Amino acid sequence: MKKNKLALALIISGLCAAGTANAANDRYIIQVDNNKKGVVKALAKKLGGDIKVDGNGFIAAQFSGHDLASVKGLLNNPHIKLIEEDQKRVPMALYNDDAGNAMQQQLTPYAVYQSQADQVTFDANAGMKVCVIDSGLDASNPDFIWGNITGDNDSGTGNWFDNGGPHGTHVAGTIGAADNNVGVVGMAPGVAMHIIKVFNAEGWGYSSDLAHAADLCSQA
């Protein structure tokens, strides 16, 4: 294997981390052992609580008009471990590409912000190579330094430099698009890349092809 190689797997998703807002509608989480939950549920209902969730080791109940201190007083019971506000959770903010026309100016892809790659400095002399296993790379795209790019073909999907759908070019661009005042600029502009085309135009590939691609990456 060559020195200082880097194989990257990028997973850009819309999964959300939790942020907090205010407690929702006087709703509280009550932690309690499962074998004592029946007693606590009965007490909560007796005191005006509306059971919303019956979970493993806890219940969530709404006590209209009661703040946290008053609910703790109402449920002064040895079986209860903890009472806390049932916080609303909101998704982590999604990042967008810079506003503008990529044909007229250079934009930064949203994933650069999402991964916080814009907060670190890229060392162009580090001897780094990134292997991208995806749907190929569009050879007609001028936003890459093609002298820094190699690839391997796949028997099922064809040449790595034939675009098998936009995803591979998008991912490769997010990683290494050139800093050339047009299109997009990647996390590591102009970085050496090795492209392996596994996913077809329908967006899928075989597990065996993916495993083989990983081996090819280690040899690139």
Predicted features and spans:
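Second-shell loop/turn segments in exported
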Residues: N159-D162, F199-G203
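Acidic glycine-/aspartate-rich tracts in secreted/extracellular proteins
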Residues: N35-K37, D67, K88-R89, G136-A139, ...
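Extracytoplasmic/secreted envelope proteins and their assembly/folding machinery
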Residues: K41-A44, L68-V71, I80, G168, ...
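Active-site core segment of subtilase-fold serine proteases
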Residues: A102-A192, D209-H212, L216-A220
